[in-house]
């Protein structure tokens, strides 16, 4: 019997828009695009085609404040924030995939 291994993708901190000044947003009217699931649906479809077994989607309900002891830099440059809630995001990804497992992590402090 051959040894099997599993392929997983960890969608982690930084899967938000990252920098508003980068080429990614395109124009000012596209800034809200980070709120749309299209980018992540495309990623999930690609992982499905590549025979990945599952995607883990990290949940974090905080804005860091380690740089200069302030949230300001993280919010100004969209570093590590904002991002979509994994519990909601998986409801968009599931219908778009055939065999990809979706594993959202949920902060227990946010879900009763």
Where do the language-model regions lie?
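N-terminal beta1-alpha1-beta2 module of alpha/beta enzyme domains
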Residues: 1-99
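Acidic, glycine-rich active-site loops and adjacent beta-strand->loop/helix elements
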Residues: 61, 106-112
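A short, GP-enriched loop/loop-strand-helix hinge that lies immediately N-terminal to
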Residues: 101-105
């Amino acid at each position: 019997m051959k040894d099997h291994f599993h392929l997983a993708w960890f969608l982690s901190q930084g899967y938000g828009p990252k920098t508003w000044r980068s080429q990614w947003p395109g124009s000012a009217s596209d800034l809200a695009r980070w709120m749309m699931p299209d980018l992540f649906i495309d990623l999930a479809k690609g992982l499905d085609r590549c025979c990945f077994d599952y995607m883990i989607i990290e949940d974090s309900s905080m804005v860091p404040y380690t740089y200069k002891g302030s949230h300001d830099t993280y919010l100004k440059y969209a570093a590590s924030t904002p991002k979509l809630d994994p519990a909601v995001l998986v409801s968009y990804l599931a219908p778009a995939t055939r065999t990809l497992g979706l594993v959202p992590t949920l902060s227990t402090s946010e879900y009763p």
